[in-house]
Amino acid sequence: LHVGLLEYVPFIILLLALFTISGGVRLTGALVGTPIVNLAIILIGTFLASWMGTTGAAMLLIRPLINANKHRKNIVHIIVFFIFLVANIGGSLTPLGDPPLFLGFLKGVDFFWTTTAMFVPMLIMIIALSIIFYFLDSYYLKKESIKVETPQDKLKLGIEGVFNLGLIVGVIGAVLISGFWKPHISFEVYSGVHLELQNLTRDILLLILTYISWTYTPQQIRKDNEYTWFPIIEVAKLFAGIFVTIIPAIAILKAGTNGALAGIINAVSSDDGPVNIMYFWYTGVLSSFLDNAPTYLVFFNTAGGDPITLMGELKNTLLAISAGAVFMGANTYIGNAPNFMVKSIAESSGVEMPSFFGYLFKWSIPFLVPLFIIVSWIFFA
């Protein structure tokens, strides 16, 4: 019940708000999915992700990206790199970007600490993946032998449902309220389960914003977006299972050196202090298969849990934990919430996405792991 009311329900409410509001925004005009246009959309989303959340940026731009590539036969690689960059790595610069960083902010990490600390590792990942994507997309386009023609209608680019962008700002504000406002008022909804006022306020505001978007956005916009409830329902079902099954796994990790995973906890420390490269890899690998937010917290506390120390003399340790949690959320569909939502939206639009293990072994391991090795060698070795 504790996990359900205090973690799962707020999580789904946030996803519902972003999914509904972003579904009311439609990019109109003659946008054709060439390699440079696709890369531009992905990079715009990557930039936005740190400020409106990976989920918000992904939900805002996935449909325009798919629509721009309706003429293409093979766009799986486009969706995959969108997941890599927009749904994960792009959220590195602020606590608004990704849930693990927001938890760090609630624990006392400065709001802009990640902006400076994560900038260079993130930039390396973005530049490398952008170059790879451009040549890969160019290769697939050439292989398809499709002549990309400029549309005849010459319709200028525009945005329908623009008021929803204001609602997304409202979502960001509601999330920030729960982080900054501490009235120290809570309601006991069940024995030992307390709902804090700031979190209740956030969730109510998110539901109000969702209602406003659904009620006042012309339904034709959603129809043109091929909007359905299927992706959010599928994600709600999947993450219900994940939230239940991670409870024992996180409990074992929290047991530290006294638990069944004592080997992992021991591996990240030595007589000389934290072993940063191990913090990066263990946080990352576990974040790929568990929820990356509680995994971040476990290793944050393992490293001492003092934000002042972790931002000071142990700044590379905090960087390793942060980068591992955010970057490696891209390794699997369940590593970060928007991954599976993007997959579901793509599939509902007719794109044949790879299976769980197909994504892992064909895409994330070949393209991401070599870059993670380089990043870990540069910053944490």
Predicted regions span which residues?
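Juxtamembrane and boundary regions of transmembrane helices in multi-pass small-molecule transporters
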Residues: 93, 112-159, 327-381
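Juxtamembrane interface elements at the cytosolic ends of transmembrane helices
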Residues: 20-24, 56, 60, 98-101, ...
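Hydrophobic core segments of alpha-helical transmembrane domains in multi-pass membrane transport
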Residues: 15-23, 45, 122-134, 164-179, ...
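Helix-loop-helix module between adjacent transmembrane segments
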Residues: 22-29, 44-57, 86-94, 121-133, ...
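Membrane-interfacial helix-loop connectors
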Residues: 49, 59-74, 78-80, 86, ...
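Transmembrane alpha-helix boundary signature
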Residues: 1-3, 18-33, 47-60, 248-260, ...
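Transmembrane helical segments that form the transport core of multi-pass membrane transport proteins
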Residues: 168-298
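Interfacial loop-to-helix junctions that mark the boundaries of transmembrane helices
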Residues: 1-10, 111-121, 153-159, 184-204, ...
